[in-house]
């Protein structure tokens, strides 16, 4: 009787709810239930999601703008800005031993096709610094833009990709909405085949048959 009573309570209080009817061991019922549970994970994840903006969004671009107050009221996302200079301080504070350890990991995981190892090393330091700052502030998503790199030597390209691999959401050119959605979908899809990642639209391969 518990499920029916619980359903009645939701109906009586006019609460938004999902009703799934069927035998609990049937594959179609389990699939619908699993889909609902993943949506619930996304909703719960959203309520405590913090997004770190390194600087502002790209200038003269409207699509990356948004109402940060409204999105916190409706979805729970806390979207705030940290100075790029703060990130630079964290980068400068990364120990050489930490960088050496991450460079060893990168060399084992990737085929580094460049003699500009110092550039890769800087990306390693940036990854360590960004992760440290994100974790310190409890943020699971971040954004940045090439127009706001005060004191940084490079745009954190490899560092951003690596952080996405570790479950953080990311959006380019200050697009905090995309970074937050990427983090939410990553949480919803945990344990499934495939993955979720941010990709610039001009990198798509739309060749017929090879999309």
List where the protein language model places each region.
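An N-terminal assembly and electron-transfer interface module characteristic of large anaerobic redox
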Residues: 1-211
């Amino acid at each position: 009787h518990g499920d029916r009573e619980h359903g009645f309570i939701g109906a009586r209080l006019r609460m938004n709810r999902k009703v799934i009817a069927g035998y609990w061991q049937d594959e179609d019922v389990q699939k619908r239930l699993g889909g609902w549970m993943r949506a619930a994970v996304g909703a719960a994840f959203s309520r405590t999601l913090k997004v770190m903006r390194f600087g502002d969004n790209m200038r003269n671009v409207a699509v990356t703008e948004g109402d940060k107050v409204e999105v916190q009221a409706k979805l729970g996302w806390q979207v705030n800005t940290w100075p790029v200079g703060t990130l630079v301080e964290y980068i400068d504070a990364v120990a050489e031993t930490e960088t050496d350890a991450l460079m060893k990991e990168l060399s084992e995981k990737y085929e580094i096709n460049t003699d500009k190892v110092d550039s890769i090393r800087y990306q390693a330091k940036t990854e360590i610094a960004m992760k440290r700052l994100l974790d310190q502030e409890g943020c699971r998503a971040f954004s940045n833009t090439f127009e706001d790199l005060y004191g940084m030597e490079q745009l954190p390209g490899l560092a951003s990709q690596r952080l996405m691999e570790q479950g953080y959401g990311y959006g380019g050119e200050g697009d905090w909405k995309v970074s937050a959605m990427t983090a939410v979908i990553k949480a919803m899809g945990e344990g499934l085949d495939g993955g979720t990642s941010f990709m610039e639209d001009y990198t798509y391969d739309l060749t017929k048959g090879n999309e």
